[in-house]
């Protein structure tokens, strides 16, 4: 009998989330409590943090058999398994002692068992950052903007205008400016207390693109020369958040 069981309706959502997570962190510890399933970890350079939370109500079945369960995973291994997820697949995760069973269910059932990673769980605090700018957009808008900038710059600069968000990238050969606004339909919501700006390594934004593919919406929050917070919102109240430290020039 499994120590814990999590049954989710859409395996591909987890496929896309884990594809982004594994580009930033190698290993991590999931913590399941009565409220939900969570993960919080820093990358090795301490430039980026990944913060995942899914409420228990988002699962078809959520059974932890006690107050809490912790299980460590290699995201490289988990991502390789989840790449096999098809459009119609449901996902079951079962904690079986020192192993994690990953089941993909549709017309049949495929089971992959991978070893848990033994690591000390360190509860990281949530970053204390005040944001003056908040822009909410579709996942497709976020993906297209980052892809337009990727070939031309190693740095992404966010600039808050009065009624629009400006994304800027430049190199010796080209400068790219992308303006997103509610009036043009590219933003779902926009708030700017001041016209702040901040710059970040575009590499981290590129690594978020898989997760954005499955997101209902993406929220970008930042302040002058402060860490950016990028929230991926998913069906059922799930959330995958990335914090990235700024590049100070």
Swiss-Prot record:
MF annotations from Gene Ontology: DNA binding; DNA polymerase processivity factor activity
Gene Ontology BP annotations: leading strand elongation; regulation of DNA replication
Assigned protein family: Belongs to the PCNA family.
Function: Sliding clamp subunit that acts as a moving platform for DNA processing. Responsible for tethering the catalytic subunit of DNA polymerase and other proteins to DNA during high-speed replication.
Matches recorded under HAMAP family: DNApol_clamp_arch (MF_00317)
Subunit structure and binding partners: Homotrimer. The subunits circularize to form a toroid; DNA passes through its center. Replication factor C (RFC) is required to load the toroid on the DNA.
Name recorded for this polypeptide: DNA polymerase sliding clamp 3
Organism of this sequence: Aeropyrum pernix (strain ATCC 700893 / DSM 11879 / JCM 9820 / NBRC 100138 / K1)
Lineage: Archaea, Thermoproteota, Thermoprotei, Desulfurococcales, Desulfurococcaceae
